Amino acid sequence: MASFQSFGIPGQLEVIKKALDHVRVGVVITDPALEDNPIVYVNQGFVQMTGYETEEILGKNCRFLQGKHTDPAEVDNIRTALQNKEPVTVQIQNYKKDGTMFWNELNIDPMEIEDKTYFVGIQNDITKQKEYEKLLEDSLTEITALSTPIVPIRNGISALPLVGNLTEERFNSIVCTLTNILSTSKDDYLIIDLSGLAQVNEQTADQIFKLSHLLKLTGTELIITGIKPELAMKMNKLDANFSSLKTYSNVKDAVKVLPIM
């Protein structure tokens, strides 16, 4: 079996090996000239990261780190890069000796030594980073949900107060939320209160009409409240014709007029 010694770096080999054993990432070198592209060098960082001993690693293909949730698409990306002798970077779920999953940011680069190709793989455990990303994603999802509160008023009537700015992203979130809720609640009316909107522009007006069309498809009628004088002036400047919609000064007035289901 080929080994790290075969690279022939006289006088510097031990220094290089000690240096690699002190870095905080896993380092492996594989030899594609041998059957199944086995690992011919592994540093202590890889040993500590995976829990496997050096003798359990040398001579094996790196696929022994794969498991139940390893993404086949990323494995294919690695395989293609190796076949083409190209560098590749992936973030992939791997497994330690004890079965613990960890996120591995894997960088593989081809290395030429005396007309012979090797592959150098650098592994960085980014599990904590992925956990933080998931927490952030969950927090943003919760914030989005809180910014789209569908409030049941009484049987057949719900209200959606809009506060702040109605961005494209938030509008899409509202559409998704309304589609899910109204498909089960079967409300006859949805009151959207605009009094809390910080800004009204052509996009806002267009979004309101899109919501009206969407609600008609679900059998729910849109009611608009909170169009204050200054808001009405802005709407007029934008040529937004709300005459096709039922509008009231506030939610309370709308509820008084709407029939009891």
Swiss-Prot record:
CDD domains on file: PAS (cd00130), STAS_RsbR_RsbS_like (cd07041)
Listed SUPFAM superfamilies: PYP-like sensor domain (PAS domain), SpoIIaa-like
Listed PANTHER family: BLUE-LIGHT PHOTORECEPTOR (PTHR33745:SF8), RSBT ANTAGONIST PROTEIN RSBS-RELATED (PTHR33745)
Free-text function comment from the UniProt entry: Exhibits the same spectroscopical features and blue-light induced photochemistry as plants phototropins, with the reversible formation of a blue-shifted photoproduct, assigned to an FMN-cysteine thiol adduct. Although it is a positive regulator in the activation of the environmental signaling branch of the general stress transcription factor sigma-B, its precise role is undetermined.
Gene3D superfamilies named in the record: PAS domain, STAS domain
GO molecular function: photoreceptor activity
Name of the protein in question: Blue-light photoreceptor
Domain PAS: 12-87
Post-translational modification S-4a-FMN cysteine, affected residues: 62
Keywords: Chromophore, Flavoprotein, FMN, Photoreceptor protein, Receptor, Sensory transduction, Transcription, Transcription regulation
Disruption phenotype: Cells lacking this gene have a twofold decreased response to salt and ethanol stress, and a somewhat reduced response to energy stress, indicating that PhoT is a positive regulator of sigma-B activity. It acts independently of both RsbRA and RsbRB (YkoB).
Record-linked Pfam families: PAS_9 (PF13426), STAS (PF01740)
Top-level taxon: Bacteria
Subunit structure: Homodimer.
Changes after translation: FMN binds covalently to cysteine after exposure to blue light and this bond is spontaneously broken in the dark.
Keyword Transcription: yes
Keyword Cell inner membrane in annotation: no
Segments traversing the membrane: none
Domain STAS, first and last residues per copy: 147-258
Domain PAC: 88-138
UniProt xrefs under InterPro entries: Bact_StressResp_Reg, PAC, PAS, PAS-assoc_C, PAS-like_dom_sf, STAS_dom, STAS_dom_sf
Gene (UniProt): pfyP
